[in-house]
């Protein structure tokens, strides 16, 4: 499939079934109006040590046997609801092999195993992380941050995410683009009445990921927060660029 194009302007009016449009793994679930990535108790409070993923049920082609590589654009709105201090650990938009599974909770964001998280030879995933916890062991900067991860929890690029945005329980809009010609992955994060954040990095997705991937959202909780995806648009096309 050369082109993938879908839009969920909200999650109120769609009767999503697990595995038909959106696949839920781990603790992720559908609630009225949102995809909830991590667990809450009967009172709606966050459950610690939780991890979950919500992904598009059809695979996305990143490249083909003729040498074409795909460009893509995705936008989504999310709410990272903070229930007090401390709060951890954040969420990520990811691309991974279609048979990949949800991994460890906390700072691993459901994308990595703790034994191999920092070893690029043991992982196959590219992610844009929105990280609310400082993990010094992984060379995190000393503040909440947006990062680009390539086969490792140790980000190849980061930018500061100001505390009042990261912990403010405000709806954020993310735009992520990948240009197959320049091989530049870019993320723009914005708030309606606040700041904009931008981060870019060169990564050749055709060299680090398989031909077909699973795309979606992953989150891990160490402390008191819950992640909700409120809308999602995605478009990709094999545009003829030689990979």
UniProtKB/Swiss-Prot annotation:
Binding-site positions, Ca(2+): 131, 133, 135, 140
Pyrrolidone carboxylic acid modifications at: 1
Keywords (A to Z) from UniProt: Calcium, Glycoprotein, Lectin, Manganese, Metal-binding, Pyrrolidone carboxylic acid
Binding site for Mn(2+): 129, 131, 140, 145
Presence of keyword Ribonucleoprotein: no
Lineage top rank: taxon: Eukaryota
Pfam family, one: Lectin_legB
Additional observations: Binds one manganese (or another transition metal) ion and one calcium ion. The metal ions are essential for the saccharide-binding and cell-agglutinating activities.
Complex and partners: Homodimer of Alpha and Beta forms.
Protein task: Lectin which has a strong affinity for both the Lewis b and y human blood-group determinants.
Designated name of the protein: Lectin-4
Species in which this protein is naturally found: Griffonia simplicifolia (Bandeiraea simplicifolia)
């Amino acid at each position: 499939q050369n082109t993938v194009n879908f839009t969920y302007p909200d999650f109120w009016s769609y009767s999503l079934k697990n595995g038909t449009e959106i696949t839920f793994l781990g603790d992720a679930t559908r609630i009225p109006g949102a995809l909830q990535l991590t667990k809450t108790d009967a009172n709606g409070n966050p459950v610690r040590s939780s991890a979950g993923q919500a992904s598009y049920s059809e695979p996305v082609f990143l490249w083909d046997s003729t040498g074409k590589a795909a460009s893509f654009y995705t936008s989504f709105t999310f709410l990272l609801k903070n229930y007090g201090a401390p709060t951890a650990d954040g969420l990520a938009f990811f691309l991974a092999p279609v048979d990949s599974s949800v991994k460890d909770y906390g700072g691993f964001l459901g994308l990595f195993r703790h034994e191999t998280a920092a070893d690029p030879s043991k992982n196959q995933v590219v992610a844009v992380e929105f990280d609310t916890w400082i993990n010094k062991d992984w060379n995190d900067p000393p503040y909440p941050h947006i990062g680009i991860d390539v086969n490792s929890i140790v980000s190849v690029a980061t930018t500061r995410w100001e505390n009042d945005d990261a912990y403010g329980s405000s709806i954020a809009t993310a735009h992520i683009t990948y240009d197959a010609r320049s091989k530049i992955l870019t993320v723009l994060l914005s708030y309606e009445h606040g700041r904009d954040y931008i981060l870019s990095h060169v990564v050749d997705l055709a060299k680090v990921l398989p031909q077909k991937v699973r795309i979606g959202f992953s989150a891990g909780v160490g402390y008191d927060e819950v992640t909700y995806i409120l809308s999602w648009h995605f478009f990709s096309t094999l545009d003829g660029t030689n990979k």
